[in-house]
Amino acid sequence: MFKKLFGKGKEVQKDIAIYAPLTGEYVKIEDIPDPVFAQKMMGEGFGINPTEGEVVSPIAGRVDNVFPTKHAIGLKADNGLELLVHIGLDTVQLDGEGFEVLVSSGDEVNVGDPLVRFNLEFINNNAKSVISPIIITNTDQAASINIYDENAVIKGETKVIDVTMN
């Protein structure tokens, strides 16, 4: 009843597709060279070894968090799914150098909307790895997660995960 009164009758879709936010090579989460991600301590997901320096939104939703160091963005879908797009590994230490954020916290985004541009060569030379984890940070709230084992992925086009939220 409250949802009808306050939610303006809008039915929230529990199913959501997560698309590749970067163009490059798909990497299984277990193969990400960082135990925090590989052991799924932050949640289920996958990685991409990018071939170009632009991140687009992998879901429709809103920007929940832009990290001050510009290396990561948190997104939230209407159904509650929370997603972290983390550009490279140990890139927090670059303190924003090599990154240009194109969105702000609270912005509405659609699949394929540009979020961040980054200097791929700079990250390659100055970070542990350019492999970029994409993590469902509230995995525990998902009823089901189906990950497609892709090879090459194209930003905003290749569907990588189907999620049904509780």
From Swiss-Prot:
Binding residues annotated for Zn(2+), in chain numbering: 71, 86
Taxonomic placement: Bacteria, Bacillati, Bacillota, Bacilli, Bacillales
Listed GO CC annotations: cytoplasm
GO BP, sorted A to Z: phosphoenolpyruvate-dependent sugar phosphotransferase system
One GO molecular-function entry: metal ion binding
Keyword Cytoplasm: yes
Protein name in the entry: PTS system glucose-specific EIIA component
Assembly information from the UniProt record: Heterodimer with glycerol kinase (glpk).
Positions of the PTS EIIA type-1 domain: 34-138
Residues annotated as site: Important for phospho-donor activity: 71
Details of cofactor binding: Binds 1 zinc ion per glycerol kinase EIIA-Glc dimer. The zinc ion is important for dimerization.
Domains as described in the record: The EIIA domain is phosphorylated by phospho-HPr on a histidyl residue. Then, it transfers the phosphoryl group to the EIIB domain.
Primary gene name: crr
Active site: 86
Cell compartments where the protein resides: Cytoplasm
Disulfide bond sites: none
Cofactor(s) essential for the protein: Zn(2+)
Database matches in InterPro entries: Dup_hybrid_motif (IPR011055), PTS_EIIA_1_perm (IPR001127), PTS_EIIA_component (IPR050890)
Short name of one Pfam family: PTS_EIIA_1
Keywords annotated in UniProt: Cytoplasm, Kinase, Metal-binding, Phosphoprotein, Phosphotransferase system, Sugar transport, Transferase, Transport, Zinc
Residue numbers bearing the Phosphohistidine modification: 86
Function text: The phosphoenolpyruvate-dependent sugar phosphotransferase system (sugar PTS), a major carbohydrate active transport system, catalyzes the phosphorylation of incoming sugar substrates concomitantly with their translocation across the cell membrane. The enzyme II complex composed of PtsG and Crr is involved in glucose transport.
